[in-house]
Amino acid sequence: MGNKKFIFGEDHLVEILRLKHQEGLSNRSIAKIFNCGKSTIGDFLTGKTYSDFWKQYHKKPLATGSVENKLEERKVLKGKRFVFTSAQNNTFVHEKFLKSLETYCEVMDASLIVSTFHYNKSGYQLNKTKDLWYDPKIRGYIVDEPCQVAEGLVFGGEINILPTAVNPLSGFHNYFSHESGVIPHVKIQMESLPSPKNESARFLYTTGAVTQRNYIQMKAGNKASFHHCFGALVVEVDEEGDWFARQIHAEQKTGCFYDLDKYFTPEGFTFGNNIEAINYGDVHAAKLDEVVAKTSWEKNVGHSSILDTLKPSYQLVHDAMDQQARNHHNIKDPHFLFEMFTNKTESLKDEIIKTANVLREMERDFSEVVVVESNHDTALEKYLKEQDYRKDPINAVFFLELQLDKYYAMERGNKDFQTFENAIIRVAPDLYKVRFLKTDETFRVKDIECGQHGNYGVNGSRGSISAFQKQGIKFNVGHSHSAAIKDGVYYAGVSGKLDMGYNKGGSSWSQSHILTYKNGKRAIVTLKNGKWRS
């Protein structure tokens, strides 16, 4: 049988390869299947026979595949702090930024992890992936495989997305299943993903890049060059397994960057630096999460809050009031009204006092509290316009006081009068230093517009992330309760409870704040279990 000459067709040869490489059969077992000698199979597999087939096969495999998802076989990263970034083929690194990252990793005991992507291979006459060149300075940091960073967080090092992709996170919403994911890409983006109500929201993050701009000078390349970020994502894992992610965004010329109160350079670092501003997640005082309040701004709680650690020059407050006592959404709901009655939470004045107390907790000599006009705050004036004090005895006196103040203001021609600000000052005259922004009043922190809540878009339409993107400037906003970053627009989350009663079903809400540094770069921090960092 072994001396018999066999002539296989192409389909047979492909099947032999499948049996060998996918099924893992021995040459002897394959020979039995084809009723031929073992040497016949061996000669074919070593390329001694069927040279025409091998010429074609080596140019492009005729068939391949895998039953199992190899991406589920994730490497488990060792350590408690990681810095993720990306690098492009045939492109020099930003030397100063890389050195600043290396400084960071040395000081903070962190691991630098770089995932590679390729672009414009034809421009370098690169025919095969193995011909790609990467700057030797980062080769020791390259990880191009999926990694488990912590419970609930995966690094997608295997993902290769063109740097010209407008929405690099598109299509990845369930790629990491029930976990959050870090995706290597030159942009800095973040998206909140919904989870069942009793679970934390998931996130998708991109990393920014450590390599220089290197684009084809056409439409897609020009746009990508504009949005190219010298950046990285820091991930810390504490002893309880909770992980905390935040963005690093380097200065273009110097390669230096802030991370919380530290400033890193190619030569070293400084600490104890103050930040420029913090945009708290929407406050909703009547539904405030007390743990978030203690962690974020309260005094004398046994540890330094975010406010007293980072000492921002400005605190931006959105939806300071919730207006739960008399909200237009449930003012005609008898069951809700009875619940408010039994809970003794019907008094609008009491809710205003509670809101004023929250603002008072935020006051510091080093920081100005700025209240951004928001839809829940302006609901108070809507209440004055639409409701009848005669049918609301518990609020009648306060209603009439506020209504009279409003009419006096209109009589004087004071178009800047705000009912919410007036109500706060009525119950807490000591808060006169708090600044209340008016409708469409601009408030710039560095070059970032912070005077918009997020409920209004353009031309009177509803607010959306795309509406702010199109305006051509950077924004820090709130309103959605779902933290996000997209092309210069940053969304804060919520400081109130994650379940406010009306947000039924799955939720993408998170208790997240925006930090703006002295150089105008930003990061988002998300609180978990009363913690905001490792």
Predicted regions and their residues:
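Short alpha-helical "recognition helix" segments of helix-turn-helix
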Residues: 29-32
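Active-site metal-binding loops of divalent metal-dependent hydrolases
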Residues: 85-90, 116-119, 157-160, 184-187, ...
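Core catalytic region of metal-dependent phosphoesterases/phosphodiesterases
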Residues: 58-149, 168, 290-418
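DNA major-groove recognition helix of helix-turn-helix
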Residues: 45
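Conserved beta-sheet core of the metallophosphoesterase superfamily
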Residues: 152-154, 158-241, 448-530
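Short, amphipathic alpha-helical "recognition" segments used to contact nucleic acids or chromatin
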Residues: 7-25
